Amino acid sequence: MTVEGIGNLLVLKEGELFVCARRDGDIRACARSGQGLYSSDTRHLSELSLTVGGRSPTPLSMTTQSPYEAVVDLANAGLEGEGGSPIPARALHIRRTFLLGDRLYQRILIRNHSGTRVATEVAIELAADFADMFEVRGACEPVFREPRSALGRIAHGISFGYVGKDEIRRETVVEVTPPGRVVKDSADKARLTWALALEPLQSMEAEFTVEPSLEGSRAPQHSFRGARAIFTSKSKEWLDSCARIDCGSAGLHRVLSRGVSDLRSLMTPSEDGEVIAAGIPWYVASFGRDALLTSLEMLLLTPEPARKTLVHLARMQAGTDDPYRDAEPGKILHELRRGELARSGSIPHAPYYGSVDATPLFLITASAYWHWTADLDTLQQLEPAFDAALQWIDTYGDRDGDGFVEYLSRSSSGLSNHGWKDSQDSIVHVDGSPAEGPIALVEVQGYVYLAKRGMADLYRAFGRSERAALLETEAAKLVEAFNEVFWMPEEDTYALALDGNKNQVRSVSSNPGHCLFSGIVDANRAQSVADRLLETDMFSGWGVRTLSSRSLAYNPMSYHNGSIWPHDNAIIAAGLKRYGLSQEALTVARAVLEAALESPESRLPELFCGFEREEGRTYVPYPVACSPQAWAAAAPFMLLQSLMGISADAPAELLSICAPVLPDHLDHVRLQNVRVGDSRMSLDFQKKDLATSCALVDQTGEIRLSLDE
């Protein structure tokens, strides 16, 4: 992926729209640039640049007010005014306020702080290239389109239009108040200008909106203030529906607050309600694996995203065998795209099913949702989807009948690797050579085990006790075979995978940590697996690396071969706590939470580089990591849930707390509005010396609290 770094961009998202701009508020996209205004995998605005007197203003500050609003303060550069008189630098204060919702709203306020009259021109350059996100990412070569777009004038602005190879007309409609002069530069570029004439301390204000449109559809127009009120109300509704976490650390409180707001911003409209998009800017789309794992991570916060994710993925479940899309009956989607290339069939993503783990994760999430909500009505409606998913695991998943689930890509346009580490070079032998398929990933066997155990409980609730007993028998057989075939005694951990010849892929990786999470690890080996994960070649001080630094394929700057992923570490910490390894879980959680505290935005990115932690230095960012990213934003909530030992059994009206622990810098955590079934609870966790206790503060409903401190 050859794209610009995005760490310093202004990023906003609301609904279907998101914008990535420079910190001065300009959008100046070029090849392989993430900058732009996007909707449905299409860049509807590739340039939005402000000049005053023909020069770009000087940035002063940028503040993100919320995931959908930002304020940029600027000052003019030295200019020549009317009659050639000089306008000194910083004579004009320029404020650009961005608001994103059903369209992009921008308000520009210019105030004259010089002692004399200022007269010059204000201009905004606009362009729309309608690039597909796969072109922007560099995932495919740029598509030649002729004509690229057509520009037209409307009553209060301009519109750009383009008919794609999918025969869909896409438009970008720009409306301006007060009306400016429109200058058409080319087929896909225009300039709006206003004459600026300000006496000392006088101000000028202009507003404009940019609305992406498909086939002429338009959203109702709102004023800037009215739009802000709508989005603020939606944000408050989300916050009120979530559990509240208060703690004694101001830094951690900021991390948690940022996570809650980022997760809300990533909720994206679909036919099934709002579902979680994976991350901005590259993955604002439905990803099965990402949505499911994020839903699991945030069950303590709210179970509602899990319900919507299950309903959405069940509706999109594959019903036919389609090699181009790596689809087979019962399989859960990997990625759903809605841009020109996907709709026209140029790429197989409408949807694409190249994920080996999304299907068992679908079942795991269903079971977890059941335990948190006891919502049998929703789950019974999805029963046919569960049946189909289990059938996929046992037939298409287990390709050769050896009891393990494997993958082998059949699509010439799809992914070569189908686990969460899906980059081309991520599944390698210790000598760095790529493993040949079919590949049986270590963590996927754990997912299948946990899926069958969880579905056995759910099927009993459905009244299908014989099916439940069969699933338990299958899970028990898998545990035995797994621990025999995947174990590497000389490394005291499990192999990354089995290759197509059933040989171990003997690389030491983070993947076995997911096996702790699933419970497939033999109890006598859990400590060994934990110790191996925390050796210096795996644990950097900022978290567990994806691949051992002793591997020939190790690269701390790579995507999957030595980097550190917060969600990966959250799952590992949950697995460690599952086996009673509280101090090891605390070590992992502390590292990741301290990385979050180091972030200037109190936000965990998708991943960061795997370099060793050094005194006085922060982690090294991965330059094109998504930020915000769903499963990274949700990771702190899973970490806290694991450390505090919280598990729910809503069908039994029970919430259990087992051996809670808190990090060194945290002495107190209060949870409020925690939902278990139809009940709500508030809990206090207090640490004194080395012991952490839990007390019930308040509750509604019949839920019982079980304490094992």
Roles of regions detected by a PLM:
Residues 1-91, 100-103, 115-117, 129-135, ...:
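An extended acidic
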Residues 67-92, 174, 659-685:
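Edge strands and adjacent loops of beta-rich recognition modules
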Residues 71-76, 246-286, 311-353, 399-440, ...:
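Extended glycan-interaction surfaces of carbohydrate-active proteins
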Residues 92, 103-105, 112-285, 376-380, ...:
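Acidic/polar, glycine-enriched structural segments that form the non-catalytic walls/loops
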Residues 113, 119, 197-199, 205, ...:
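Beta-rich accessory regions
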Residues 220-234, 251-258, 302-316, 375-394, ...:
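Extended, well-ordered alpha-helical scaffold segments
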Residues 284-416, 442-445, 449, 505, ...:
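Aromatic-rich carbohydrate-recognition surfaces in CAZymes
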Residues 625-667:
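Catalytic cores of secreted or luminal carbohydrate-active enzymes
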